[in-house]
Amino acid sequence: MENKLSFEEAISQLEHLVSKLEQGDVPLEEAISYFKEGMELSKLCDEKLKNVQEQMAVILGEDGELEPFTAVGDEA
């Protein structure tokens, strides 16, 4: 799966695959292929969401409040 996809692109592709599978007229081999691709897209979306959660935790700090911004080199 191409990790260069944005979250929105991955979700869109996943929705498209789900729509195809829900129609019910997909041959078995093709359905399995769609399912595998969908699982990869789902994993990619999950990884991207976890990354955003980690970034938000850093921004908000442990107490849930915004942390003051410190520019690189301004730590002292």
Curated annotation (Swiss-Prot):
GO annotation terms (biological process): DNA catabolic process
Keyword vocabulary terms for this entry: Cytoplasm, Exonuclease, Hydrolase, Nuclease
EC number: 3.1.11.6
Subunit structure: Heterooligomer composed of large and small subunits.
Pfam families per record: Exonuc_VII_S
Job of this protein: Bidirectionally degrades single-stranded DNA into large acid-insoluble oligonucleotides, which are then degraded further into small acid-soluble oligonucleotides.
Subcellular location, record wording: Cytoplasm
Sample GO molecular function, one term: exodeoxyribonuclease VII activity
Keyword Cytoplasm appears in the UniProt entry: yes
Family statement drawn from the similarity comment of this UniProt entry: Belongs to the XseB family.
Name of the protein described by the UniProt record: Exodeoxyribonuclease 7 small subunit
Superkingdom field: Bacteria
Species whose genome carries this gene: Bacillus cereus (strain G9842)
